[in-house]
């Protein structure tokens, strides 16, 4: 191990506010474990429009308290230059999420920022809702969404107008990410950052407001038998509250996946798009003769649906198929309403919008761009992201998508039809739109460049 690298590690250890990660680095240093140290010091974890996301491990290349503190301090500097004064922080139930939320809250409150913290692990859409509903300038969500269990992340939402961009409780876009990244790079000592415990816990009334608003999407509850899985994430509590408020009582939980578990023990990857991820839910649906399977990813901002297809048996609807279903039935709130999807999605929603005389816009990849469309009525991306109620959550929301598809299936059943029948009607008008996802997983971005 060369002396320059060894000194870099020693300096980080001295500045690490977390005794546990500092001790781990010191142990690797003492045992001359350069392999692990190089993994932890492979450059700084890069901050971008998706915030931070990476493996939970010591050093500048991982998600840990030191990196979270440094990032929070950079956001504080950005906020002060922009005249922003308040933040709300949420978290999922992944490894390190609670510690990272507390560290972030300590940095923000120590800098004099009004800091609110959601009471317990909750879906990402609740944080997006709270950012707007509480009138906060910034929202922070500690989550890695549907990443593998060893990962965690740090997402940033904005509540107002920055650089002429109206955020309204949506994720940051360029150039805001670069402005924040520049401030993060200017943070020197991590250990000497002022920390305080002056944050406030947000009362659960904010959850009740979200539940009430979202439940209004379903005005005619039925008796469909629906299987639900939270994929070991944080969706169960909130989704059950929404369905109960809306009058849907016949939910069958996948008990083995209903409660938060950061190890995601029953799935290879906690992503409903992954082959096999919904097998357990589909097996329960088959045995119970259910009408529908609904799945959220671990932070419940995405929604997957499986149906019993007479031709092939139970299958998962592709994201574009579900997008077409929503676009066909979602009401046009006004002549100003706009449908939108990203360039990686099908062209079917554009055709449906044209037939319904609804304005349509196509955006760059990522829901952060869809959320910036003014007068958005419905937005989606093929990766199971749907915004069916932008007035409540101006971002993808797996809970609202779930209750809405339950209502759609109920209404169709009342007419003696199914979701497949509706899709057939759509294809008969616009032509069949085939779609298939191909996923290639790599450890480093350089492998695909």
Regions found by a protein language model. Give the residues of each.
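Phosphate-binding and adjacent anionic-ligand microenvironments
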Residues: 286, 290-292, 315, 333-449
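Conserved phosphate/anionic-ligand binding catalytic regions in large, soluble enzymes, centered on
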Residues: 41-61, 145-147, 230-238, 242, ...
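Short acidic, glycine/serine/threonine-rich loops at helix termini
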Residues: 98-103, 128-131, 150-156, 193-195, ...
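N-terminal small/polar loop signature for handling phosphorylated ligands or for N-terminal nucleophile
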Residues: 88-151, 242-305
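An N-terminal, well-structured beta->alpha segment
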Residues: 3-104, 111, 201-224, 234
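Gly/Ser/Thr-enriched, mixed-charge loops and adjacent short helices
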Residues: 12, 16, 20, 36-45, ...
């Amino acid at each position: 191990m060369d002396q320059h690298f060894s000194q870099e590690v020693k300096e980080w250890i001295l500045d690490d506010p977390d005794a546990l990660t500092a001790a781990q680095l010191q142990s690797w240093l003492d045992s001359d474990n350069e392999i692990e140290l190089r993994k932890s010091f492979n450059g700084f974890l890069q901050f971008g429009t998706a915030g931070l996301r990476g493996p939970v491990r010591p050093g500048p290349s991982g998600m840990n308290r030191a990196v979270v503190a440094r990032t929070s301090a950079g956001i504080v500097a950005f906020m002060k230059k922009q005249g922003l004064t308040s933040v709300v922080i949420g978290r999922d139930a992944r490894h390190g999420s609670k510690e990272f939320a507390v560290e972030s809250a300590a940095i923000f409150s120590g800098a004099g920022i009004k800091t609110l913290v959601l009471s317990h692990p909750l879906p990402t859409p609740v944080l997006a809702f709270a950012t707007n509903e509480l009138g906060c300038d910034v929202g922070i969500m500690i989550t890695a969404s549907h990443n593998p269990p060893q990962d965690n992340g740090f997402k940033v939402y904005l509540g107002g107008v920055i650089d002429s961009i109206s955020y309204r409780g949506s994720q940051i876009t360029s150039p805001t990410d670069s402005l924040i990244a520049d401030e993060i790079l200017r943070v020197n000592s991590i250990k000497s950052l002022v920390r305080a415990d002056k944050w406030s816990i947000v009362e659960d009334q904010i959850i009740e407001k979200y539940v009430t608003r979202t439940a209004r999407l379903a005005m005619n509850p039925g008796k469909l038998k629906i299987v639900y899985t939270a994929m070991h994430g944080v969706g169960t509590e909130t989704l059950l509250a929404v369905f109960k408020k809306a009058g849907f009582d016949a939910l069958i939980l996948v008990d083995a996946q209903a409660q938060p578990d950061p190890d995601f023990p029953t799935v290879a990857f906690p992503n409903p798009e992954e082959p096999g991820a919904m097998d357990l839910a589909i097996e329960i649906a088959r045995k119970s003769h259910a009408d529908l399977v609904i799945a959220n990813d671990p932070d419940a901002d995405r929604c997957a649906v499986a149906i019993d297809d007479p031709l092939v048996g139970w299958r998962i609807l592709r994201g574009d198929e579900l997008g077409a279903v929503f676009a066909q039935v979602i009401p046009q709130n006004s002549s100003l309403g706009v449908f939108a999807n990203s360039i990686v999605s099908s062209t079917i929603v554009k055709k449906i919008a044209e037939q319904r005389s609804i304005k349509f816009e196509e955006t760059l990849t990522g829901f952060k761009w869809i959320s910036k469309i003014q007068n958005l009525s419905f937005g989606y991306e093929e990766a199971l992201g749907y915004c069916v109620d932008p007035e409540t959550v101006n971002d993808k929301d797996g809970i609202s998508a779930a209750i809405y598809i339950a209502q759609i299936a109920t209404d169709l059943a009342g007419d003696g039809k199914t979701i497949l029948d509706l899709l057939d009607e759509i294809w008969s008008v616009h032509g069949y739109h085939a779609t298939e996802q191909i996923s290639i997983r790599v450890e480093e971005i350089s492998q695909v460049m």
